[in-house]
């Protein structure tokens, strides 16, 4: 049987739950009070818009969005074109240079082309106050993203989960290892990348798994949108 569950179905189900209504209300109240919240309201659910549930091939978990101006746009680790590449993504590019033959470090951090190929770039908290890292951690987003991971676990087969750092690894503890391929490494941040993120070869391992299971490999070279 073909599973036709979509993110629209999952989100509609969550929106009926009191915790999620409360989460959305708290974020709306922050914006209404004049606080700057990232990403902009229209971008909060971009990961779901760009990577449909039925097309998820790889999941990369982040934590909360970048909290500087013009950075966050709803995809974990990604920044808008024209913004300096953040340190963790610089380290991801360094790893890609050594892991993927022919990869050349791009001069931008815009990862939408990954998302369109089936790489779910999911932050575990989807909003943040400007300049205040982890400021929305208690808003209920973690419950929502637990349920998102559970939906991928249940409705997809053979997804590669790249879990970097203790937070992502704890978050991914519910994943069925018999149905999905789970890879662990330290976080790519400058604080921990040298403890085993560099040399982990997760990007090539993900592609090998996908091709061995009848899926197309990911082109990890991020593309800017055509002008």
Swiss-Prot record:
Keywords: Cytoplasm, DNA damage, DNA repair, Hydrolase. It is an enzyme of class 3 (hydrolase). It is found in: Cytoplasm. GO terms for cellular component: cytoplasm. It comes from the Bacteria. GO terms for biological process: base-excision repair, AP site formation via deaminated base removal. The keyword Hydrolase applies. SUPFAM superfamilies: Uracil-DNA glycosylase-like. PROSITE patterns: U_DNA_GLYCOSYLASE (PS00130). InterPro entries: UDG_fam1, Ura-DNA_Glyclase_AS, Uracil-DNA_glycosylase-like, Uracil-DNA_glycosylase-like_sf. One of its GO terms (molecular function) is uracil DNA N-glycosylase activity. Pfam families: UDG. It catalyses: Hydrolyzes single-stranded DNA or mismatched double-stranded DNA and polynucleotides, releasing free uracil. Excises uracil residues from the DNA which can arise as a result of misincorporation of dUMP residues by DNA polymerase or due to deamination of cytosine. NCBIfam families: PRK05254.1-1 (NF003588), PRK05254.1-2 (NF003589), PRK05254.1-4 (NF003591), PRK05254.1-5 (NF003592), ung (TIGR00628). Belongs to the uracil-DNA glycosylase (UDG) superfamily. UNG family. This is Uracil-DNA glycosylase. The gene is ung.
